[in-house]
Amino acid sequence: MVPFGGWEMPLAYPSGTVAEHRACRNSAVAFDVSHLGTVRVDGGDAFEHLQRSLSNDLTRVHPGRAQYTHLLDEDGFVVDDLIVWWVDDERFDVMPNASNTTDVIEAIGGRDVTEDRAVIAIQGPEARSRLARVSSEAATVHRFAVRSFEWAGATCLVAGTGYTGEEGVECAVPAEVATAFWEAVLGQGVVPAGLGARDTLRLEAGLPLHGHELGPGITPLQAGLGWVIGWDKGPFTGRAALEEERANGPARRLRGFVADGRQPLRDGSLLCEGEEQVGILTSGNFSPMRERGIGLGFVDADARLLDGDAITIVQRGRELPARLVRPPLWPVREESE
């Protein structure tokens, strides 16, 4: 167990991170992601309030859908990246990162219902077929759809979301049935997986992690996430700063990297073109599928490097040859919306 965002979390189960990772790519795994916050925002003004508070445009979706979005500060920097579950006309369940729940509540209001439920993510190409033996209702939810389902006499929620680059769902179940639901899912041959596999999977999928690719000093445009900005809607926090950055172009951009060898890449390593530093690695690890070191990092906009170009990663005094690769760093298989 390791501390993570104020929670004690399993880094891996006995099978180990690499086996858990490959199980997600080839069959199905389950993550207990109950550390993710749930902030409930409801009432007749909830929609308009979130439209003003968050970057994405809620008119792009409707009740029964989920949306990825950002909470920004006035400088356009990412306070947190969130998933909003639009449960019904006047109820939104906002899912912040573990350590940011308090900051999110201060910014958007709502009430913390994190400890009332557990969130179980079932991911992988066989996730739905195995989950169907536990709940056919939960297994048939489409990507980024949200619906309620009944299980063991309790009302639960399921969304077609995840953080792995695979098909799958995330189930929010009341705390009193959480252990039974977890055991029922594992009883269908679903492999339990920990934080280690969750990180290598999201890294292969090219997905950002708050505190690494997102956070203070980083804007959505720098992170290549301009699509989470609702340019066509009205005012929202950080809009003016983002409009200025869009006009001038971001000073740096997030890129993907694949090393020539198996050495795991590490965050904080320098990205160099010849003798010149052109960026910094923000996340790195070993890819169990590529069997190479992989990473994400920011490269200065004036470096003019293209996908496929060679780059040197200076890591703990060693020079590791690598190439720029447009994320994802492994083919994703998420179903279409």
What is each stretch, according to the model?
Residues 1-5, 9-12, 85-337:
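Conserved, structured C-terminal
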Residues 1-72, 77, 196:
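Acidic, proline/glycine-enriched N-terminal capping motif
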Residues 32, 81, 170:
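Acidic active-site catalytic centers that drive phospho-/nucleotidyl reactions
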Residues 60-104:
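Well-ordered mid-protein domain cores that form the structural environment of catalytic cofactors
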